[in-house]
């Protein structure tokens, strides 16, 4: 449904921006068959290939992180604050990045996989556009836990698909809420492969094009999301039957969650920046989100299983 909207808008159509979801064939309530050709490879697989080549265990960075955290945090009688905790995590992230995991793993893999420099250039451009689509959905739909194993890249056409694309609810109530400190995954290896020009240029403009295309009509996005959000809220209620009678009516919860999603999509369109007569860039809201997603202080707050160094 959303792709039909993108096809009708000139800014998204000329960039080739689409949301890619693998075709699923339901076998049972717990089992689905997904389309997945041999050209796809996950970031986790790329990482494990690198670890095998350099002779380190795939869990060594996580083990080193946990052991250093435990030995430093538990040692001594000094009462540490949240600032000390954040500084320690930043030091650990820098140590793992410098000594164990380079930010060039994805770039080197893609360079070796392409047959010519022109193919690599096309792959980088297509990868940037596809990551813009996945990052956009991650942010507006409150999708969390974007582990490397859930990001799959096609080596033949640059298509990027995400598995487990499910909104995250607050534990206390059926309201969308992502616990991740970063709005989407823009880890060091993704940053290096896209490059600074691609991030500030193609990636940022794609965010704005997607947000503008989906929020240009009066109630278009709300109508598309209502059924989807309704199913998610009903699923939350089915798992909390003993508490559901004390909560608000489902119709109100659906409206609230839809409004939150639309609010984030409008933020990505940067319409507020266009209306103001200020000296700040029009896409300042998008640049702020990119900064939050790529800043080491935010990445360091992620769980080590999220692999903020990859």
What name fits each language-model region?
Residues 1-133, 153-310:
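ATP-dependent kinase catalytic cores of phosphoinositide-metabolizing enzymes
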Residues 145, 149-152:
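Catalytic-loop signature of eukaryotic-like protein kinases
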Residues 11, 143-145:
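Short, solvent-exposed loop/edge-beta patches enriched in aromatic
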Residues 138-142:
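Extended amphipathic alpha-helical scaffold segments
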């Amino acid at each position: 449904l959303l792709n039909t909207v993108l096809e009708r808008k000139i800014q998204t159509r000329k960039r080739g921006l689409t949301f890619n979801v693998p075709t699923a064939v339901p076998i049972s309530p717990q089992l689905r068959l997904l389309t997945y050709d041999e050209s796809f490879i996950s970031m986790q697989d790329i990482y494990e290939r690198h670890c095998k080549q350099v002779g380190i265990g795939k869990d060594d960075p996580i083990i080193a992180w946990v052991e250093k955290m435990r030995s430093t945090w538990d040692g001594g009688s000094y009462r540490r604050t949240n600032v000390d905790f954040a500084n320690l995590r930043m030091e650990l992230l820098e140590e793992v990045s410098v000594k164990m995991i380079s930010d060039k793993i994805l770039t080197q893999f893609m360079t070796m996989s392409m047959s010519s420099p022109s193919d690599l250039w096309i792959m980088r451009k297509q990868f940037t556009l596809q990551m813009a689509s996945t990052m956009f959905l991650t942010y507006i739909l409150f999708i969390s836990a974007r582990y490397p194993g859930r990001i799959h890249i096609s080596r033949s056409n640059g298509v990027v698909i995400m598995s487990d694309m499910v909104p995250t609810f607050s534990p206390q109530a059926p309201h969308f809420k992502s616990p991740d400190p970063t709005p989407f995954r823009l880890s060091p290896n993704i940053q290096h492969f896209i490059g600074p020009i691609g991030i500030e240029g193609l990636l940022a403009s794609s965010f704005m094009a997607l947000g503008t295309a989906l929020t240009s009509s009066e109630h278009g996005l709300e109508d598309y999301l209502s059924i989807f959000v309704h199913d998610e809220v009903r699923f939350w209620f089915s798992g909390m039957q003993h508490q559901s009678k004390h909560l608000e009516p489902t119709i109100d919860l659906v409206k609230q969650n839809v409004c939150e999603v639309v609010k984030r999509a409008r933020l990505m369109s940067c319409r507020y920046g266009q209306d103001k007569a200020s000296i700040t860039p029009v896409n300042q809201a998008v640049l702020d989100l990119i900064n939050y997603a790529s800043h080491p202080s935010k990445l360091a707050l992620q769980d080590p299983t999220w692999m903020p160094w990859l």
